[in-house]
Design a protein with these regions (language model features):
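Structural signal for interior beta-strand "rungs" in well-ordered beta-sheet cores
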Residues: 1-182, 186-187
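Terminal amphipathic alpha-helical/low-complexity segments used for targeting or macromolecular assembly
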Residues: 1-5, 10-11, 16-17, 53, ...
């Protein structure tokens, strides 16, 4: 059902079973796929694609221009996957030409009120962003990350899978997977054991990650030495992912 007060461009592609509430504005070249519900006063701008089964709450703004002074109206996009919940006043900006040109959001994410996803961000799946969580431009977020309220991530940072970011945290560097980060200049505060247990990590896998965590963050060893010991003494795919994340970091890691 489409409310009579909604303004929908003739070149927007809206699947027949999409619900659109009152006073929504949907611009040209927007794609909205089946089963999605768009509540009142939502603005979706040109070049946005929204997948199946999403629920978008009032006053969300998706696909707006990037907050980048070099942007001159180029044709860039926002791609949003399936089954996402996007709450009130969320803003998701389109990409920039000098970035990837696309801002991407995966599947099954819960993006709470006033959260912001800036230009060229790549957000994975099963991510939770609490109220006012903010991602600056070019941030990459892996799957199953949780952001507390009012946290902020610096441009070009990466957040590893299963990380937990506490509320009011400022993130100036990459956050490795599986850890808890907190503080105005984020520091590691342990392994995210509760999150790992909820996602069926075995006791043995968690124990190995704890050993790696202690070497990385609770020893006085240089980072390269810690990584060398981990690679020589610890095994498993999660260890490999942890080491690969750290060794490919360009900004350095929170430590």
């Amino acid at each position: 059902m489409v409310d009579s007060t909604a303004i929908i461009h003739k070149n927007a592609h809206i699947d027949s079973d999409v619900d659109i509430g009152p006073y929504c504005i949907i611009e040209e070249n927007v794609i909205v796929k089946k089963g999605t519900e768009i509540q009142g006063h939502v603005v979706i701008q040109s070049g946005t694609e929204i997948g199946e089964g999403c629920k978008i709450s009032p006053f969300a703004s998706i696909g707006g221009p990037p907050q980048d002074l070099t942007y001159k109206g180029e044709d860039t996009r926002v791609l949003i996957g399936n089954n996402n919940i996007i709450k009130e006043y969320v803003t998701i900006n389109r990409g920039t030409p000098h970035g990837k040109g696309i801002t991407k959001v995966g599947d099954n994410n819960f993006i709470m009120a006033y959260a912001h996803i800036a230009h060229d961000c790549v957000v994975g799946s099963n991510v939770i962003m609490a109220n006012c969580a903010t991602l600056a431009g070019h941030v990459e977020v892996d799957n199953y990350v949780i952001f507390g309220g009012l946290c902020a991530v610096h441009q070009f940072c990466r957040i590893g899978k299963y990380a937990f970011i506490s509320g009011l945290t400022g993130i100036p560097k990459d956050v490795p997977p599986y850890i808890i980060a907190a503080g105005p200049r984020a520091k590691p505060y342990g392994l995210n054991v509760v999150g790992l247990e909820r996602h069926n990590f075995s006791k043995e896998e968690i124990l190995i990650l704890k050993k790696a965590y202690r070497l990385l963050f609770r020893s006085s060893l240089p980072l390269n030495t810690s990584l060398k010991i981990i690679q020589e003494e610890l095994e498993g795919k999660y260890i490999k992912e942890l080491v690969d994340f750290i060794t490919t970091s360009k900004r350095g890691i929170c430590r």
